[in-house]
């Protein structure tokens, strides 16, 4: 179990998948991300895309803090069940949960005309995801993101430096113990 830290649903508990399939983002890190995006005004009314959603905690934290809508993408069936449960418990209707491999789902979103739709994109891929696969995912995000969109990637602190695809511009990287939050922004 984990909880939402701030905003409308602050203090509400969320289920997390059992086992080691997912690695829920720590409350401290979700709070830091939420605070950073709120401070820049990026969350108010934002459309959020949460890639590798796991329990949905990261995206739901942002929804709680002022985002207007959330699309959560996850491929693991147990995690999908958990994120759907968490959405149901919070009684939010502005959430769409999509099942499947992230790269495949991004292509489907682009094909259905979801271009320039998302104001904030968060990605918490498995720490073992090859850099080439992450680069492919980030490149696929570009046509789906709105001008000025924030893109935030959670990575292990031992990961190679993140290479942002053009035109995403690196803003900063913050370290929290064994975790890095890498912030980028589209022009």
For the regions a protein language model found, what residue spans apply to each?
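Class I S-adenosyl-L-methionine-dependent methyltransferase catalytic core
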Residues: 1-187
């Amino acid at each position: 179990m984990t909880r939402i830290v701030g905003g409308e649903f602050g203090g509400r508990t969320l289920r997390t998948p059992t086992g080691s399939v997912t690695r829920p983002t720590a409350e401290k890190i979700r709070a830091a991300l939420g605070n950073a995006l709120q401070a820049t005004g990026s969350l108010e009314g934002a459309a959020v895309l949460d890639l590798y959603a796991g329990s949905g905690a990261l995206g739901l934290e942002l929804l709680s803090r002022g985002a207007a809508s959330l699309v959560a993408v996850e491929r693991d069936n147990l995690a999908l069940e958990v994120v759907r449960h968490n959405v149901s418990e919070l009684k939010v209707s502005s959430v769409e949960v999509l099942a499947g491999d992230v790269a495949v789902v991004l292509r489907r979103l682009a094909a259905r005309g979801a271009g320039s739709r998302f104001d904030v994109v968060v990605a918490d891929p498995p720490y073992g995801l090859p850099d080439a696969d992450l680069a492919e995912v980030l490149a696929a995000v570009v046509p789906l993101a709105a001008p000025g969109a924030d893109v935030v990637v959670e990575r292990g602190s031992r990961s190679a430096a993140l290479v942002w695809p053009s035109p995403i511009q690196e803003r900063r990287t913050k370290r929290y113990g064994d975790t890095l939050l890498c912030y980028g922004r589209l022009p």
